[in-house]
């Protein structure tokens, strides 16, 4: 197989062969790191599989590797030890091949499960993205604005995701030379500590904000039906907002099905632990299409919840956004208020109505003063990093 020859060109352009030689001089090992790394990368693209199977598959290449599996495993330990410097060197070498747009970077975390019940090293029990009862290892990833990976970190599966952002940002500044940057994250990584960290110097943040978690007076403002501006992503000078303000209740949802509306304001938040105050912009968007999507999804979940109640299989009630059991409530008393020996389950109409209030609405927080339409567009680019994980 000579397909790896096309990959070989990119491998050398990124200077990975020279990086390996530098590591060899430092550690004085007796095997060829360049051969092992190139073999692992080529087979990862051509024949994805385990390290052992990669070594076997590489025997199909015109240039076959001489390393054995024990040397491959020892090399992996060296690569792990030098990983920060390897990533920084690859980034700097990539700048010679083309422009890297690192003015806006996206960060997200995922985790990988192991078919084992024992915790060991990085493999720890934590919150699994797939809700599997297995130990997991966590991975954090930065991509640039174009979706090209910048840097990653590997952490134990029981580590809080919010604590992984700052250390990797520090590496970007110290080793990559990236300091003037806008960091985009989802709501799960948007702790106020992380926002404050990106609210200094030449750094800024854009993050998803759950409208269910903001103060009541801000919720009332966010869900008002009047004072909305239409977002135009195709403006003459880039994304822009309309001068006209709209009342959502007066609009034809079919005519404006693909439209996006926006409203914004500045808010102040004080951290209870330190007393520090953060001033940020709350940008709220509304979409009829998004509203209808949430309603349709909920209708199916309610139907599923009714089936569970009818079968008497409610069991432990759920809280997850995707769990239909969150719409089921449990009662252990009679209509007269007396304690009952038998538990009864029914639909939680109050929970359903509470969720319906937020249908179609979406929140973003930022400390940037740029056009709100531009902020919305930048935040929309977060799908790129999710694509990388797939």
Range-by-range predicted roles:
Residues 1-3, 13-390:
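Anion-binding and metal-coordination hotspots
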């Amino acid at each position: 197989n000579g397909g790896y020859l096309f990959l070989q060109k990119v491998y050398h352009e990124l200077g990975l062969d020279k990086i390996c030689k530098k590591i060899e001089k430092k550690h004085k090992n007796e095997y060829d790191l360049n051969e092992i790394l190139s073999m692992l990368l080529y087979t990862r693209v051509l024949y994805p599989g385990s390290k052992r199977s990669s070594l076997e598959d590489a025997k199909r290449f015109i240039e076959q590797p001489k390393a054995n599996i024990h040397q491959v495993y020892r090399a992996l330990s060296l690569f792990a030890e030098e990983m920060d410097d390897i990533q920084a060197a690859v980034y700097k070498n990539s700048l010679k091949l083309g422009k890297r747009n690192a003015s806006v970077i996206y960060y997200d975390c995922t985790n990988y499960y192991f078919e084992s019940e024992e915790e060991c090293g990085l493999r720890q029990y934590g919150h699994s993205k797939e809700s599997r009862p297995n130990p997991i290892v966590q991975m954090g990833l930065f991509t640039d604005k174009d979706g090209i990976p910048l840097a990653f970190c590997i952490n134990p599966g029981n580590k809080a995701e919010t604590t992984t952002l700052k250390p990797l940002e520090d590496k970007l500044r110290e080793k990559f030379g990236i300091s003037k940057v806008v960091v985009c994250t989802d709501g799960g990584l948007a702790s106020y500590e992380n926002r404050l960290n990106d609210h200094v110097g030449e750094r800024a943040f854009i993050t998803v904000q759950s409208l269910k978690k903001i103060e009541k007076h801000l919720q009332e403002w966010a869900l008002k039906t009047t004072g909305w501006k239409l977002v135009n992503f195709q403006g003459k000078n880039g994304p822009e907002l309309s001068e006209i303000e709209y009342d959502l209740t007066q609009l034809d949802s079919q005519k404006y099905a693909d439209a996006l509306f926006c409203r914004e304001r500045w808010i102040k938040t004080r951290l209870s632990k330190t007393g520090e105050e953060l001033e940020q912009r709350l940008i709220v968007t509304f979409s009829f299409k998004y509203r209808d999507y949430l309603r349709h999804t909920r209708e199916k979940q309610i139907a599923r919840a009714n089936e569970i109640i009818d079968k008497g299989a409610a069991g432990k009630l759920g809280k997850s956004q995707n769990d239909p059991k969150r719409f089921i409530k449990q009662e252990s008393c009679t209509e007269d208020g007396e304690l009952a020996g038998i538990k009864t389950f029914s639909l939680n109409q109050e929970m359903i109505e509470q969720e319906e209030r937020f249908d179609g609405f979406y929140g973003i927080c930022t400390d940037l003063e740029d056009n709100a339409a531009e902020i919305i567009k930048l935040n929309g680019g977060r799908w790129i990093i999710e694509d990388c994980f797939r």
